Structures are given as C-alpha cells and as structure tokens.
C-alpha cells in the first residue's frame, strides 16, 4: 500500500495579548494625535509627547536622556512604551524590563542594570566585500629562486585569468591563495570566486560551456557569472554592545580534561568587568571614527520603576551621563511613596528628587466613559468576539466604576457563557451579569475581607 500523509503547516496561532491592538502612536503627519488610530483611544497629549520623543530618537538627539510616564493603573503607560518601539521599527534596539527583574543572587544589581543598558545600544557595522568572480581561462604559477638557497624553487605569485559575461581580467595573486586553489582542485574551465579582503577562494562548479565535453561526469555545471569580474558588495550587520560584551567575556575552553569537565557542568552567569567594557568601547569608538560602524542609541524601558532601590537610582544618575547611553523610558503608577532601600525618605513616584529633576515627565490621565466604551469595542473586535450594545454598555459601566482591566477581563468568560447558553448573536447583558457574579472585582473582594475578617488567617 502506498503511504500518503498530510503535511501540516507550521503557522502558529498568535495569542491575543494585552496590547495586541496597539500598532503605533496614531499620529497625523503634522504630529497631532488622531481621536482614534493605530489601536489608540484618548491620551492625545501623551501620544503627541511620545511622538516628539520618537522624532528626537530618530534624529539621534535624545541619547542619554530619560522620560517618565506617570499615571494611575490602566491608563496606558506600558502601551505608550510599546507604541514608541513600534514607531521606531525593528532596526532600533528596544529592551523592556520590569523594576524587580534586576535582583539576582548571582549578579549584583548595578551589573544587571548595566547589562540592560548595553542591550539597548546598537552598533550598525557596514562592511564592503570585494569579490572577483568568473570562469578560469588561465592558471599559471610563477616560480622564483628559493631565498633559503639550494636548488629548490618556490612559487612567487600566481597569474590567473577570469572571464565573466561582461569582460575578462588577469590577476596576480599571493602564493597563499595558490594553496587554497590547489585544495579546491581548480582547473581551467571552472567557475570560482575569490574574496579580496580575506583571500578566501571557493570553487562554484564547472562552466556550462564544457557540459558536452564528457558523457559520464559527476560534475555540477554552472553558467558564467553575469556582470563584471570585480564586484563590490556591502554587508550591514546589526549587533548590540551587550552581544560584543558576551562574545569577549566568555573564554573559549581548552582541550584538556578539566576544561571539558567545566564545560559539561552548569555554567555560572559571567559578570562582565568594567575594564572589558572600556576596551570594547575603545574598539567601537575606533570603528566609528573610521566610518566602519555607526552607533544606534535604542530605548531601555523600565516598567514599575518604583521597585528599584536607592543604589539603583544612584547608578542610573551616573549611567545617564556616560558617553554611550540609550534613551531611558521609566513608568510608575505610584504617587507620593517611600523610596525603596530607605527607611522614611518619601518622594513623588518613589523616585529620588535628584533623578526626578533630570526626567521629562509625560502624564497619563484616566479614560472617560466614552473612551472606555470605544476601547472595549476595539478589544472585542481584536479578540474576534461579538457583543450586543446593552452588554457593551454594561461592561463599559464596570470599566468606569471598577477598572478598565476588570472590564476587559470579563469579555472572554462572557463569550464562553454566551456559547454555552446557545446565543448565536454573541455576548448579551445576561452573560455579563452572570460573569460579574462568578468573578469578583478588587473592591467587592476587599469588602468581603473586611466584613468577614475573623474567618481569614491574618
């Protein structure tokens, strides 16, 4: 029996995340915010301010500065940072972290912070490769007297003729390339290419002009290359400074037993020294001076910045003043609170006043009932849910009275209840009411805890 099986596609279903609907900042060409665009509703002033920040980043005039997104929970601070990253595109590095991420048992706080700083700084390296490509028409090694004496002779250079569709060239090559040509077993009639910078030689195949020469031959025939024999290709590579740090910090293991055993054991996280970073900075600066590389300052986004302690804030002060630093976007939903790591020093947003004075602060404001309704309709469309107008009003009411997050979280359970209850028209008001009874919001839960406090442990 002939075996026939279906090949399944490897396309993945994208999960609808909290900010899937955000596609950009939703700005007009003149920089003013549209009422609703790119998944955004409201927050016009904050979006316009972020648009100015994006323009400064693109003009490379924002490096070493910091922005604070300040506002209550559910006002779109993380969404603004995500929109900034999408406006900048994939070529500009964007490194999002949470304030609590930098605490580790293996690596000190300031090291983890610096690591993320370096992740947010890109380096665009442009390399021009010169290549000679064509069919070999002549292969003549030139001999010379052996400089060590005796009767032996050495290869002084190699004369090679290359032919392409647009012309021919005769090259004088180094004897080291002759060895590479011998290894590749190149003969007249083969198509080869030689890299001028490295001297690497590669045999592509036999010219198709010789295809009828033999009846039986396990040879790959290729056409004569188009264009000139001498070609220039520009290769652009994007790396971050952290990639360079890691490449130089990890020592290559030897061949002895102890090195091999060390490689088998679980490796500890390497802490990159300040001296190594300074050496890499010197090399990077030299590349920039030569015009080989170009620095691309990216964005480091630190969410819940009030979770950093006083030592981290002090380090941030210094890091922002360094010659190579990215744009730092901070987000905090705290008002006047105690700075972490201190006993009783309180400040606005949980950030020390000296750092707060350096920040450009962008406020985010609570959404109006109409804006909440539009956001819920947009989320329902993104998640592929049908919702009736009375049900939408009910969910929007929860968004105004309780929180936008609670209202959005009711949508999916309500759609499941609507399907179970056999409602083809989508989510109805009864489904939202049933969901509301099944899942409590934070205020009702707190009221129950206060009412029945003796039934709980603490």
Curated annotation (Swiss-Prot):
Record keywords: Activator, ATP-binding, Chromatin regulator, DNA damage, DNA repair, Helicase, Hydrolase, Nucleotide-binding, Nucleus, Transcription, Transcription regulation
UniProt cross-references to SMART domains, sorted A to Z: AAA
Region (Disordered): 1-29
Entry EC number(s): 3.6.4.12
A GO CC term assigned to this protein in UniProt: R2TP complex
One GO process term, biological-process aspect: chromatin remodeling
Subcellular location per the Swiss-Prot or TrEMBL entry: Nucleus
Catalytic activity: ATP + H2O = ADP + phosphate + H(+)
One MF annotation (Gene Ontology) recorded for this entry: ATP hydrolysis activity
Stored InterPro entries: AAA+_ATPase (IPR003593), P-loop_NTPase (IPR027417), RuvB-like (IPR027238), RuvB-like_C (IPR041048), RuvBL1/2_DNA/RNA_bd_dom (IPR042487), TIP49_P-loop (IPR010339)
Residues where ATP binds: 71-78
PANTHER family (UniProt xref): RUVB-RELATED REPTIN AND PONTIN
UniProt record similarity statement: Belongs to the RuvB family.
Assembly description: May form heterododecamers with RVB2. Component of the SWR1 chromatin remodeling complex, the INO80 chromatin remodeling complex, and of the R2TP complex.
Record function comment: DNA helicase which participates in several chromatin remodeling complexes, including the SWR1 and the INO80 complexes. The SWR1 complex mediates the ATP-dependent exchange of histone H2A for the H2A variant HZT1 leading to transcriptional regulation of selected genes by chromatin remodeling. The INO80 complex remodels chromatin by shifting nucleosomes and is involved in DNA repair. Also involved in pre-rRNA processing.
Protein name: RuvB-like helicase 1
Lineage, uppermost ranks: Eukaryota, Fungi, Dikarya, Ascomycota, Pezizomycotina
